[in-house]
């Protein structure tokens, strides 16, 4: 893989189960509304104005990270960490397409819906006086 990877590059080596899970995850996300889906390094990003979730395809699972304005306590969440002052990153592991359902799909939809409101505002440079 030379240059910028594509979505196909990142998913080519997945097992059939993981490919099915990836396709279902992607289809589910596209139903949320307008967005940009693109490969970046070893991840596939899902973005409105900013990224609201991304997937890192691994050999045995899909590593999914999504961003919310609140922390979720659930056994499906493997890890959480602050992503900014207003955003908390949540990590789930997907190994089969049957996992791509509620509550994971609800959290992804929430991440899509709140991505604009939890965005860290751009810093405005103070105007010089005079």
Sequence positions of predicted segments:
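Charge-dense, helix-prone N-terminal extensions
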Residues: 1-130
